[in-house]
Amino acid sequence: MRRIGVIALQGDVSEHISAIEAAGGQAVPVRRAGIIPTCSGIVIPGGESTTISRQLERTGIAAEIKQAAANGTPVLATCAGLVLAAKEIDAGDVKPLGLIDISVGRNAFGPQRESFEAEINVEGFDRPYRAVFIRAPVVLRCGEGVEKLARFGGRTVAVRQGNVIGLAFHPELTGDLRFHKMLLEA
């Protein structure tokens, strides 16, 4: 059974833990340094990217995530996690981890009250995926080697570069475990 570290500083932590376990993995909450090196995969959940960014730096977890990703550990970054995983962010106080060579725009689909669900086609999936967008970011630019996995309204909302998958939406809120299974099978 693969052990997946779910960054548990703020955001959709319990939902990701439930999804990992439902997909057949062992989920462990990561609140301090020293846990990431014991994991075979990482989830960076949604939440508030500025808050999570500060806590990642303060706890030393940011350096461990960067090292693990550089060593090939699979990473699933969702919503605010996508913002954190980016190389560049359009605005704000977020210190990006630089795991994916992308530029990201925060809250690109509007405020919380304009949250929505939509069917999207994802590269490699045999049927549409019901995506939940909550104050979702968008990928503005993709660098060399970044694969666009899905678009919505002409905008890129899912990407992969090597062992890192970034999603603008919340797969942990859908009951559709395909992205969590991708992480476990990577």
UniProtKB/Swiss-Prot annotation:
<comment type="function">
    <text>Catalyzes the hydrolysis of glutamine to glutamate and ammonia as part of the biosynthesis of pyridoxal 5'-phosphate. The resulting ammonia molecule is channeled to the active site of PdxS.</text>
</comment>
<dbReference type="GO" id="GO:0036381">
    <property type="term" value="F:pyridoxal 5'-phosphate synthase (glutamine hydrolysing) activity"/>
</dbReference>
<feature type="active site" description="Nucleophile">
    <location>
        <position position="79"/>
    </location>
</feature>
<dbReference type="GO" id="GO:0042823">
    <property type="term" value="P:pyridoxal phosphate biosynthetic process"/>
</dbReference>
<dbReference type="GO" id="GO:1903600">
    <property type="term" value="C:glutaminase complex"/>
</dbReference>
<protein>
    <recommendedName>
        <fullName>Pyridoxal 5'-phosphate synthase subunit PdxT</fullName>
        <ecNumber>4.3.3.6</ecNumber>
        <ecNumber>3.5.1.2</ecNumber>
    </recommendedName>
</protein>
<dbReference type="GO" id="GO:0006543">
    <property type="term" value="P:glutamine catabolic process"/>
</dbReference>
<keyword id="KW-0456">Lyase</keyword>
<keyword id="KW-0315">Glutamine amidotransferase</keyword>
<comment type="similarity">
    <text>Belongs to the glutaminase PdxT/SNO family.</text>
</comment>
<dbReference type="Pfam" id="PF01174">
    <property type="entry name" value="SNO"/>
</dbReference>
<dbReference type="GO" id="GO:0005829">
    <property type="term" value="C:cytosol"/>
</dbReference>
<feature type="binding site">
    <location>
        <position position="106"/>
    </location>
    <ligand>
        <name>L-glutamine</name>
    </ligand>
</feature>
<feature type="binding site">
    <location>
        <begin position="134"/>
        <end position="135"/>
    </location>
    <ligand>
        <name>L-glutamine</name>
    </ligand>
</feature>
<keyword id="KW-0663">Pyridoxal phosphate</keyword>
<feature type="active site" description="Charge relay system">
    <location>
        <position position="172"/>
    </location>
</feature>
<dbReference type="InterPro" id="IPR002161">
    <property type="entry name" value="PdxT/SNO"/>
</dbReference>
<dbReference type="InterPro" id="IPR021196">
    <property type="entry name" value="PdxT/SNO_CS"/>
</dbReference>
<comment type="subunit">
    <text>In the presence of PdxS, forms a dodecamer of heterodimers. Only shows activity in the heterodimer.</text>
</comment>
<keyword id="KW-0378">Hydrolase</keyword>
<comment type="pathway">
    <text>Cofactor biosynthesis; pyridoxal 5'-phosphate biosynthesis.</text>
</comment>
<feature type="binding site">
    <location>
        <begin position="47"/>
        <end position="49"/>
    </location>
    <ligand>
        <name>L-glutamine</name>
    </ligand>
</feature>
<feature type="active site" description="Charge relay system">
    <location>
        <position position="170"/>
    </location>
</feature>
<dbReference type="GO" id="GO:0004359">
    <property type="term" value="F:glutaminase activity"/>
</dbReference>
<dbReference type="GO" id="GO:0008614">
    <property type="term" value="P:pyridoxine metabolic process"/>
</dbReference>
<dbReference type="InterPro" id="IPR029062">
    <property type="entry name" value="Class_I_gatase-like"/>
</dbReference>
